[in-house]
């Protein structure tokens, strides 16, 4: 996308990043249409699209094309199911505004360590557990998982 924007002499600003994000994610909702729609897949889509989810869904709906009218109708029906699931999961989990309850600063303070890859790995485990629905999106559950993960990595609180 940046190369195209440069060729067209368009600004490489937030609008370019917005277009890039939509292009990167535009096949995700369509993939959900053909598979069983899980809460986890919807949470991840909501998390990655963030506030641009509505625009992404409009783009994806416009992208449903085929010469076979029956196929188009079936895809549109399945797409409507995905949209319902998005609303349901968003209402239940508030994923669009997701913020990991565990911060790198907290991990460094508790375990008296300097910035390193372990911090990112712990945060990633917590984030994935929340997005997969394994733990609720709250501080206590995230903190417990952080401690468990840190212990497995050999970190001890001082």
Language model features with spans:
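Divalent metal-dependent catalytic cores for phosphoryl transfer on phosphate-bearing substrates
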Residues: 1-74
